[in-house]
UniProtKB/Swiss-Prot annotation:
Signal peptide: 1-21
Origin superkingdom: Eukaryota
Function summary: Monokine with inflammatory, pyrogenic and chemokinetic properties. Circulates at high concentrations in the blood of healthy animals. Binding to a high-affinity receptor activates calcium release in neutrophils. It also inhibits colony formation of bone marrow myeloid immature progenitors.
Keyword Secreted: yes
PTM info: The N-terminal is proteolytically cleaved by proteases associated with inflammatory responses. The processed forms CCL9(29-101), CCL9(30-101) and CCL9(31-101) exhibit increase in CCR1-mediated signaling and chemotaxis assays in vitro.
Any GO MF annotation of the entry: chemokine activity
Entry's transmembrane regions: none
Protein name: C-C motif chemokine 9
Statement: the UniProt record of this protein carries the keyword Transcription: no
Gene name tied to this protein: Ccl9
Cystine pairs: C57-C80, C58-C96, C67-C107
Keywords for the protein's UniProt record, in alphabetical order: Chemotaxis, Cytokine, Disulfide bond, Secreted, Signal
Tissues and organs where the protein is expressed, per its UniProt entry: Expressed mainly in the liver, lung, and the thymus, although some expression has been detected in a wide variety of tissues except brain.
Entry's induction text: By interleukin-4; in the bone marrow macrophage.
Length: 122
């Protein structure tokens, strides 16, 4: 019976931590949405790629970066398998980009130079 109790305890702990991570992520997402709405008057729809609900990670990069369509960005978390920059478009979509790509770096520089700071770091 001991393996059963161990497995049951692990399952309960995993479920509890998973719910906590979802609540934390939902709170952070609402904070980013509120910040963008206050600055741009936009209602943001968040789209997440992959199965990791507790953090935003890029599974692939978009090579077609059009900086004029973005209002902000934030880096992926340290828990992701690959580094990434997630740009937020004027329409509220998230676009993953390769942080070592020179076009991505120039876009970040432009966003930082525009009127108000618009980096949304988690």
């Amino acid at each position: 019976m001991k393996p059963f109790h161990t497995a049951l305890s692990f399952l309960i702990l995993t479920t509890a931590l998973g719910i906590w991570a979802q609540i934390t992520h939902a709170t952070e997402t609402k904070e980013v949405q509120s910040s963008l709405k206050a600055q741009q008057g936009l209602e943001i729809e968040m789209f997440h790629m992959g199965f990791q609900d507790s953090s935003d990670c890029c599974l692939s990069y978009n090579s077609r970066i059009q900086c004029s369509r973005f209002i902000g960005y934030f880096p992926t978390s340290g828990g992701c398998t690959r580094p990434g920059i997630i740009f937020i478009s004027k329409r509220g979509f998230q676009v993953c980009a390769n942080p070592s790509d020179r076009r991505v770096q120039r876009c970040i520089e432009r966003l930082e130079q525009n009127s108000q700071p618009r980096t949304y770091k988690q």
